[in-house]
């Protein structure tokens, strides 16, 4: 997914009033404020209730995998662009929760999905540094996950040094 592809998808979602946050590799890049690598997909956190509307707003994208439903949904278009939806619901207390396999639930504070970032100079909501660390630092983390966190840590150190 190129930066232009990401902006196209986000603009379509915004035109339909979809609330989202950018997660994964593009979420790291949003926090850093620049693209740091090529990306095979765009990870977005969205409400489970918005899936039908999202599919209408992104007519070129089709469901290709529901094996992790209702926690995730993978959409792809004929050009091979992929949007990986992290599907959440809101509890009465305002927490976001995601239903994972075997009945397990993961909870997120909504504030952790409201960090500010930039993609192509465009402001976006993205996963916070803390949430990115949680998503990238686990026993099944890939080499790319570890590289992404190092990029984020370098950016944070650089910002702290510039202020200090």
Identify the function of each model-found stretch.
Residues 1-164:
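Compositionally biased terminal segments of proteins
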